[in-house]
């Protein structure tokens, strides 16, 4: 998976609409640094990626069954709506396909004092022939949006994301503490090491 663009609105300390064009602003830089004082929004960029892909963040997850852990709490104080959007691409049948995943949420009547409403999850695919975005799914119900996201993400889970792409504070050893099987599964999904496993198997067969 290759990330191309992050867009967000009213997440944590980042008020209003913000965007980071990873292609245009970073070019082919293999390594880059996100730098800023505490509270400037560095981790919020990672939150936006996790929200767009998984509907939760490493710091806030409904799985913890705590009121304060609701992912909707990333909405900036005093605002009535928020969204996180990620544009990414991945190889499918030899071609690179481009997708756009969005997590969006608002309070009742989009008022700052309204009750939080259920988030909407949207997944779009870019039609390379027309240059238009095709909506694959856009719904608040997991039974509709989850199968499409699972198919595109090819089994990548929020735990994989936490362990290999984002280690939140206090979880820096998460990837190292994972079992050998868990680490192998994560690395295989991220680096497509299945090709090398097949090469190894053929080499072993030829040697025997």
Where are these regions (language model features)?
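Extreme N-terminal "head/tail" segments of very large remodeling/mechanoenzyme assemblies
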Residues: 1-153, 160-162
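Extended, Lys/Glu-rich alpha-helical coiled-coil stalks
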Residues: 33, 37, 130-135, 140-146, ...
């Amino acid at each position: 998976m290759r990330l191309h663009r992050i867009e967000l609105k009213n997440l944590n300390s980042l008020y209003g609409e913000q965007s980071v064009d990873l292609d245009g602003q970073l070019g082919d830089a293999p390594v880059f640094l996100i730098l800023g004082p505490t509270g400037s929004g560095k981790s919020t960029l990672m939150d936006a990626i996790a929200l767009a892909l998984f509907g939760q963040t490493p710091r806030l997850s409904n799985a913890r069954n705590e009121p304060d852990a609701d992912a909707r709490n990333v909405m900036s104080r005093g605002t009535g709506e928020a969204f996180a959007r990620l544009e990414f691409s991945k190889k499918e049948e030899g071609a690179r396909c481009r997708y756009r995943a969005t997590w969006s949420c608002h309070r009742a009547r989009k008022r700052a004092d309204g009750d939080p409403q259920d988030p909407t999850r949207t997944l779009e695919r870019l039609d390379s022939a027309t240059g238009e975005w095709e909506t694959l799914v856009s719904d608040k119900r997991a039974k509709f949006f989850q199968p499409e996201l699972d198919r595109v993400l090819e089994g990548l889970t929020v735990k994989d994301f936490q362990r290999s792409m984002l280690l939140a504070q206090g979880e820096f050893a998460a990837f190292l503490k994972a079992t050998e099987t868990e680490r192998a599964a994560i690395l295989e999904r991220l680096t497509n090491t299945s090709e090398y496993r097949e090469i190894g198997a053929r080499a072993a067969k030829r040697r025997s």
